[in-house]
């Protein structure tokens, strides 16, 4: 029995199939974590989502920002974008069932000392706190007012965490931290503009996992989202988005041995044309 994690797929289903074949993944004995953004911009978002649903006994996902975008558009509260490849899902006879399945997926998964989220965990949040906050947003997603949640989800404010945050401002920050975070100011404020490499990062910013006051170093955090960061295994984090969508690689890591396996993506789209 092996336990693997794979980075952002974004509809690159052929690469996922090739990678699973390369590692010899067995749905009967092995387990697979996916770091979110399973859909959108790649050519086979529908097939990727169907795969996750079909194999939900062996495959676990966390929600990424593109998955949430699909849900917002699907429930009538988000505007489609030129780069979207989610229309086949929305037009499928089982589209609503697939959306409802996706809406029930978590923002955070923990198993022992390993935690998976899409983008990261705010430095000042201990893992137990992060689990609790993820639960707040998940309850809203699964509750009766989920459509209103999607109408309030978008936005970059508030930029900083405050325990006194309430209502949709609180939920928006929680979702942004788990699904959109890359760089932080030295006051741990979210910066959504910077998307390039750590090496090129302005001096007033730092990666979320480099904050000196991190309260979650007692767990290994597995995440994706930041394709410019690439594969990273340091500071008790494993970053797995290696830019399959952009013509890079799709990466799997064996979580027991930390051995990585990659497949080269076919083609890719021009990353300069869009913002992730």
From Swiss-Prot:
What CDD domains does the entry give?
MPP_ApaH (cd07422)
Superkingdom in the source lineage: Bacteria
E.C. code: 3.6.1.41
Q: Which reaction does it catalyse?
A: P(1),P(4)-bis(5'-adenosyl) tetraphosphate + H2O = 2 ADP + 2 H(+)
Against Gene3D superfamilies, the record matches this protein to: 3.60.21.10
Which keywords fit this entry according to its UniProt record?
Hydrolase
Q: Which SUPFAM superfamilies match?
A: Metallo-dependent phosphatases
Q: Which InterPro entries match?
A: ApaH (IPR004617), Calcineurin-like_PHP_ApaH (IPR004843), Metallo-depent_PP-like (IPR029052)
- Enzyme type, top EC level: hydrolase
Q: Which Pfam families match?
A: Metallophos
Instruction: List the GO molecular function terms.
Output: bis(5'-nucleosyl)-tetraphosphatase (symmetrical) activity
Xref: HAMAP family: ApaH (MF_00199)
Protein family membership: Belongs to the Ap4A hydrolase family.
Function, as annotated, reads: Hydrolyzes diadenosine 5',5'''-P1,P4-tetraphosphate to yield ADP.
User: Protein name, please?
Assistant: Bis(5'-nucleosyl)-tetraphosphatase, symmetrical
